[in-house]
């Protein structure tokens, strides 16, 4: 069964439509990359799929409408990493990651051994184990981003939605993050990740969905979506798309003089 399915989904802000109508699916064990220029509607779409923004049309999770799910039930099924990643409280990094286990615990209960193992694995994937005792407010922005990503991974949900999680990370940690998403997918979890790095998207995602002005401009395998023609049309850039090491590499080299 398709895990997450949106049909004729629309989102309006201030009475004006900003997303849709569009349709989108997410299968078990799949990493889907969400592409598009600034203002294309990526963040708004992810919020709607997380059940955090009112929407028209339909959006279902394993056949159940998102609108019919309680916040508690949704938190057991969907984890959401927003684009804003400022940590506003002085808590140890390990405690921050442990917050991802809240949906699975009774109020006031201690972490179980299973909880601790899941937290430790999430911290390992995001390379924040050495920061466990550091205050989250006293580490770098990139380290904060990785700690918050570890918290979302520790939520251990079938669906993970991540809004530009690689932004601000060094190249090694960008690759490590995408590799972590792939490892989650290999275990049957489903990931939608919005990205501006086209090479990361093309190399690590099973499918790509390109948005433009709130609608789907293209969808398919990376080689079908990341093309010079589409990049010119949607992003307004000239780009060289080549194959390096058996995977696509994308290099924007100038402005195309198109609509952007």
Locations of the language-model features?
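Catalytic Walker B motif of ABC-type/P-loop ATPase nucleotide-binding domains
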Residues: 160-164
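ABC ATPase nucleotide-binding domains
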Residues: 232-260
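Conserved ABC ATPase "signature" region
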Residues: 98, 113-131
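Conserved ABC ATPase signature
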Residues: 110, 135-139, 143
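Conserved ABC transporter NBD signature motif
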Residues: 57-65, 74
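The feature captures the beta-strand-to-loop junction immediately N-terminal to the Walker
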Residues: 35-37
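Conserved ABC ATPase "signature" C-loop
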Residues: 213-214, 220
